[in-house]
Amino acid sequence: MTLLPFTCLILLYSLGSVMSEKTNPNLTLHDVTDKLEGDDEKYATALKTCGEVFAEVEAIFNDENYLSHAGWFKDESNNEGDVVYAKDTPHGRMVTISTELPMPVEDVMKETWNGMEALPEWNQNINFAARIAAPTSNFDIVTYGNNDVLVVSGREFVSARIWRKVGDGFILASRSVTVPSFKSKHKGKVRAHLHLAGARFRPNPENPETTLTDVVMLADLKGYLPKMIVNQVIGRIMIMDTVTNRRHFQNLKAKRTNN
């Protein structure tokens, strides 16, 4: 008796299992669906990752202890009133900061999303920034790298981003992904891993022309940096980026006023 028919059945069953486990090319969050079609279906895993990190970021911002910073500790501060709070997690030190940006929430979200590739023009810490793909208007994959900052040499990131309108504001979330077709043009830079990054933009109830902004980040900088060194500088880097970002929006507002 030949075993060929039985072998074929096993192969067919295995094939069916693989096909059934294929990543769904669609993602629905807050009543908005990102649909990947054609060649963009190769980014389905990245889209799934975005769904996961968005849920984590939203949970952090919605936690009843977030605004009071219960469970966080004060990490860094400056003379402009900026304060970084931190908490240690199994993946490393998570940091968060809140600030007020001098533009309406819709404009802040639009600039943050669409202005990504212009970051090196005004942020001295960013060496390069580019979109790898933008399969939908709410989901993209980007690469960017920073210059040497403090004791940390330049790092490269490849991450997927997603945003949604939530209530009268917005939430943006990002996490590192692997894109097999992407080849870095920046040899020598260590590829860091972004476990989680998120921003929440809300209109200021006392002044709708400004935006209340919360940012959270957890990253593994990789390389040979001791954990102690990373913990010492990550909050300071967040302070620097916050000050730079706020000044950027102040400059944008000034240009609009002058025009």
From Swiss-Prot:
One of its GO terms (cellular component) is endoplasmic reticulum-endosome membrane contact site. Keywords: Signal. One of its GO terms (biological process) is vesicle tethering to endoplasmic reticulum. It comes from the Eukaryota. Coiled coil: none annotated. Gene3D superfamilies: 3.30.530.20. SMART domains: START (SM00234). This is Steroidogenic acute regulatory-like protein 1. It comes from Caenorhabditis elegans.
